[in-house]
Amino acid sequence: MATKLDKPLFLFPTVASNCASVTAISVMYHPDGTFREDYYPNLPEHTFIHTGIIAGSPYALLWAGIGDALSKECEAVFASKGATLKFEPLMGVQLSKVCTEPLLMYGAQALAACREKRVTPELEQVVLDIIVATGLVSNMTTRIPEYYYNSSLAHCVYNGATATQFGGRHLHGEIVALGVLCLLTYDGQLEQRNRIMAFNHQIGLPVCFDELDIDESEFEAIAKRTQAGAEWQFRAPDITEESFIQCMRQQNQAGRAFLAAMQQRGG
């Protein structure tokens, strides 16, 4: 509305489920909940964050926010690979490299604080990571139609999952967290994938599609639906529908094997 009326916009996020309150990107959906398109409004003039309010917000939304923020570094680096970057997107990609580690280091403690509705340094660190750090990266790495390095295969998984039978039951960041593992699998970053897979399992984020009630028979529908998004339209030429489906299959197998091993250990 502020964009259409050409009015200044001030935002006051009450949850830390994503970076929307700092960015100029809005995701639009069809009435049935399936992904429709991305919309690019004007940036907010300022975003006011009260961590006391966010500490009292639903636990699941902070949990999903961690899953969403986990995607920022791997997607920005992956999407910009091989590109000659101008100053602003170059700065954005470099900034993305500070997004992952605070989540892995403080994420579990931040969730514990949220469960108890307490503001702690760990909670503040994670909230600012989810909302501010990833939001700034988003703004610096998006200039359609010139370039789009903001997100990639992890969000392709989410966009497509909205077309599955039960994908709508799950939160955005919950699905993106699994998409991160798919991207790292596709890119051959198996050590980092396994590290994040262990973290996901620690805090209850998914490591395979079974945990999202998505069957492998739906992977083709995911690949078809996601093609409406900027992530797919700005992908590298070597990423095909078939290779995307294959990386989802590979991660599903890896996640199942991980869960089986954890069950044997009693973890």
PLM segments and residue spans:
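Alpha-helix C-terminal capping segments
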Residues: 1-8, 185-188
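Short hydrophobic "helix-edge" motifs at membrane interfaces and signal-peptide entry regions
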Residues: 3-4, 40-41, 144-146, 230-231
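C-terminal charged capping/lid subdomain of soluble metabolic enzymes
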Residues: 189-267
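Active-site segments that bind and position negatively charged phosphate/pyrophosphate groups
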Residues: 86-198
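A glycine/threonine-rich phosphate-anchoring loop and its flanking beta-alpha core
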Residues: 4-96
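Generic secondary-structure signature for well-ordered alpha-helical cores
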Residues: 33, 52-56, 71-82, 101-112, ...
